[in-house]
Amino acid sequence: MTLQKLLALSCLLLPMIASAHKFETDQRVPPVGIADRGELILDNDKFSYKSWNSAQLPGKVRIVQHIAGRTSAKEKNANLIEAIKAANLPHDKYQTTTIVNTDDAIPGSGMFVRSSLESNKKLYPWSQFIVDSNGIARKAWQLDEESSAIAVLDKDGRVQWAKDGALTQEEVQQVITLLHKLLSK
C-alpha cells in the first residue's frame, strides 16, 4: 500500500475514531450529575429546575437524546422524534429524555433555547427535558460538539443501541422496532 493510499485511508477512518462515544451495549450510561439548571419541571403552569443525574434513568424504556443547544443539532434527529410521536408509545412504560447542552449554543441564544424547551414541556409533559448549562454530559459521554446523540435504554437503564450523529431513515426504523421489542418484555 502506498503512502498516499495509507494517508487517504487514515483520513477516512479518523472521524470514526474521533467521534467515539462512551455508550456501551448492555451497560448503563457513564454517570452524570447536572446541578446547574438540570431537569425542567412544570407544576401548575410554573417552570422550575431541579438537579438531575443519570441514576434516575432506570424504570422505563427510553430514548436519551443529547443535543447541542442549536437548531442545526435539533434538526439532525428530528425524523426520529417524529417517528416516536407517531408510534404512540405508552407513557407509563416509555419516556424520552432530552438533554440540551446550552454550553454548546450560539452565544446569546440560551434564553431562546430554554423558551423552546418550556414550550415543548407544555406540549409533552410526560417527556423529560434536562438543561446542561456546562456541557457535563457531553464531556462525560465524549459526544461530538454541535451534534445530536441518541441512546436507547431498556427499563433497567442499560444501553441497547446508540449513535452520535444524524440517524439514517433505516436507523430510525431500527430504533422504533427496538423500542416496541423492549416495551413488549
Q: How would you name each of these model-derived features?
A:
Residues M1-L7:
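Bacterial N-terminal signal peptides that target proteins for export
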Residues P15-S19:
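N-terminal signal peptide c-region/cleavage motif recognized by signal peptidases
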Residues H21-W52, E75-K76:
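N-terminal "domain-start" segment that seeds a small globular fold
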Residues K46-N79:
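Short active-site neighborhood of thiol/selenol oxidoreductases, capturing the structured segment around
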Residues P58, K76-T98:
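Conserved helix-turn-beta segment immediately C-terminal to the redox Cys motif
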Residues R70-S72, T102-I106, N134-A137, A166-L167:
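Solvent-exposed loop/turn segments at secondary-structure junctions
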Residues Q95-I99, M111-D144:
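Short, internal strand/loop/helix patches
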Residues E146-K185:
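Thiol-/selenol-based redox modules, centered on thioredoxin-like
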